[in-house]
Amino acid sequence: MIFVLDVGNTNAVLGVFEEGELRQHWRMETDRHKTEDEYGMLVKQLLDHEGLSFEDVKGIIVSSVVPPIMFALERMCEKYFKIKPLVVGPGIKTGLNIKYENPREVGADRIVNAVAGIQLYGSPLIIVDFGTATTYCYINEEKHYMGGVITPGIMISAEALYSRAAKLPRIEITKPSSVVGKNTVSAMQSGILYGYVGQVEGIVKRMKEEAKQEPKVIATGGLAKLISEESNVIDIVDPFLTLKGLYMLYERNANLQQEKGE
């Protein structure tokens, strides 16, 4: 069984794969202040609930866009799982040809998504990941990672509206009953949701025009389903794209180590 961990700025998503299939997954808040023991006990509770144990896990891979948390997570893996985790970063074999000016600037989550997207859906491809920041990644027909777009996530937009406008409340991100709001909350929900849908459609349209291709558009992340239901540019929603990519990278690198006799 392989344990995969994707650490984002707001939430961390954990999963266990068995024989190539995602057996279970969990979501927890990203907390930069937790120790390796606190993380260890939290993960133990999650595993216990599914009838699993640390001993069932034979390998671990971690992707993180929050560097301060990595020390505690790596220590947790070594102390409780007795396994040194594979970390997505310099040295890991991704198989990607990254055309960024500085490839090291590409976030680990974007690399993982690209690996999974290419293997599962082919190329050319645009991957939209709705996280704390929303990222758009373009992979061309030769499977080269060409770059992308980064925008504030939908929750950041909603929080900015709440924090900077004294009389506006904090709202739940959900579809309102009509585009024209009949009260402050529904008007804000309409503005946030449909404003964001318009942004997604506009950016994807411009990316396609610049690429002079019609790449398939894959959406992932917490709000991917909600946005896709209102948009006409998203072809596939894959909520576990990142976890699948982590598993693929683990298998790829574990096989390479076996070939080298490590």
Swiss-Prot record:
Keyword Transferase appears in the UniProt entry: yes
GO biological process, one term: coenzyme A biosynthetic process
Domain of life: Bacteria
Subcellular location: Cytoplasm
Residues reported in the UniProt entry to bind ATP: 6-13, 132
Gene Ontology CC annotations of this record: cytoplasm
Principal location: cytoplasm
Cofactor annotation: NH4(+); K(+)
Catalysed reactions, semicolon-separated: (R)-pantothenate + ATP = (R)-4'-phosphopantothenate + ADP + H(+)
Keyword Nucleotidyltransferase annotated: no
Residues in the signal sequence: none
Protein keywords: ATP-binding, Coenzyme A biosynthesis, Cytoplasm, Kinase, Metal-binding, Nucleotide-binding, Potassium, Transferase
Metabolic or biological pathway, per its Swiss-Prot or TrEMBL entry: Cofactor biosynthesis; coenzyme A biosynthesis; CoA from (R)-pantothenate: step 1/5
First-level EC class: transferase
EC number per UniProt: 2.7.1.33
Positions annotated as active site in the UniProt record: 109 (proton acceptor)
InterPro entries according to UniProt: ATPase_NBD, Type_III_PanK
Cofactor binding: number and manner: A monovalent cation. Ammonium or potassium.
Gene Ontology molecular function: any one: ATP binding
Positions annotated to bind substrate: 100, 107-110, 184
Subunit (UniProt): Homodimer.
Functional description taken from the UniProt entry: Catalyzes the phosphorylation of pantothenate (Pan), the first step in CoA biosynthesis.
Protein name stated in the entry: Type III pantothenate kinase
UniProt gene name: coaX
